[in-house]
Amino acid sequence: MDSLHVLRSFLLLFIVFNHLPRTTTSMSEPKVITIDVNQAQKLLDSGYTFLDVRTVEEFKKGHVDSENVFNVPYWLYTPQGQEINPNFLKHVSSLCNQTDHLILGCKSGVRSLHATKFLVSSGFKTVRNMDGGYIAWVNKRFPVKVEHKELKYDEL
């Protein structure tokens, strides 16, 4: 009877442990380094490239002003809703090498976090996410640039 009790206990433990949710290990999740805007500004001054992953419209209204700044939207707004830009990696790869030093930013740091994970998992080596995004950059009164559009006569 004693061995039957041990067998039942073992079987119960096996069933319980086999059905517990499994946590993902760090090997499956790319390691993302997030930096604040003070660190971002220092790295940009040292030669890092800034990749703004907001929409083109957001970018034109104002963006980080630095020597190497590119706009490649990570999310697109389509009639079906918000979708990941299917050409994101192709566009980034046409502008940057996988060994380039990149800082990614968006409005608040959420889109850029996802984009940073994507680039790291795609083989980019030195990628940083800017915490707080453009909002934090502006709040620190760091340099910004606004893309001026040509006004048409009827817009004057």
From Swiss-Prot:
Residues 44-146 form the Rhodanese domain. SMART domains: RHOD (SM00450). This is Rhodanese-like domain-containing protein 17. It comes from the Eukaryota. GO terms for molecular function: catalytic activity. It comes from Arabidopsis thaliana. PANTHER family: RHODANESE-LIKE DOMAIN-CONTAINING PROTEIN 17 (PTHR44542:SF23), THIOSULFATE SULFURTRANSFERASE 18 (PTHR44542). The active site is at residue 106. Gene3D superfamilies: Rhodanese-like domain (3.40.250.10). Coiled coil: none annotated.
